[in-house]
Amino acid sequence: MAKKITGFIKLQIPAGGANPAPPVGPALGQKGVNIMEFCKQFNAKTQSEAGMIIPVVITVFSDKSFTFVTKTPPAAVLLLKEAKLQKGSGEPNRNKVGTVTMEQVRKIAELKKPDLNSVDIEGAAQMVMGTARSMGIVVEG
């Protein structure tokens, strides 16, 4: 018989940087999950993606065991990395802070495709372009 699911926890954690400090510790502690075990498994799985923010969905079962699924980094983080910026514009409709090419947008769309609800790469690219626009990043091409 399958284990009973008691909850889901959604977090965004730096790759290879999970530790028991907030926000990870309190979120897992509330559900009774072994915090150190999660940190070890997450850090081992995401070591190759150092420096990126990785969204993770943790499924907690009634016997306090857990499984987790990592997602692709948020489009905003990938756009900032491609445009070599620290942060987006505070006023994206007035101040443009950087530019990315259509080729870079397509590359991000290819990476994000499994997590986006789009049929093709063009649809995914449109979503990434919308994110860029809301951050004050101009898409050229």
Swiss-Prot record:
Q: How does it assemble?
A: Part of the ribosomal stalk of the 50S ribosomal subunit. Interacts with L10 and the large rRNA to form the base of the stalk. L10 forms an elongated spine to which L12 dimers bind in a sequential fashion forming a multimeric L10(L12)X complex.
Has UniProt tagged this entry with the keyword Manganese? Answer: no
Q: Which GO terms describe its molecular function?
A: large ribosomal subunit rRNA binding; structural constituent of ribosome
This protein's superkingdom? Answer: Bacteria
- This protein's UniProt keywords: Methylation, Ribonucleoprotein, Ribosomal protein, RNA-binding, rRNA-binding
Q: Which Gene3D superfamilies does this UniProt record tie to the protein?
A: Ribosomal protein L11, C-terminal domain, Ribosomal protein L11/L12, N-terminal domain
Q: Which organism is it from?
A: Chlorobaculum parvum (strain DSM 263 / NCIMB 8327)
**GO biological process: what's one of them?**
translation
Q: Which gene is the coding source of this polypeptide chain?
A: rplK
**After translation, how is this protein modified?**
One or more lysine residues are methylated.
Report what the protein is called. Answer: Large ribosomal subunit protein uL11
Tell whether Ligase is among the UniProt keywords: no
Function description: Forms part of the ribosomal stalk which helps the ribosome interact with GTP-bound translation factors.
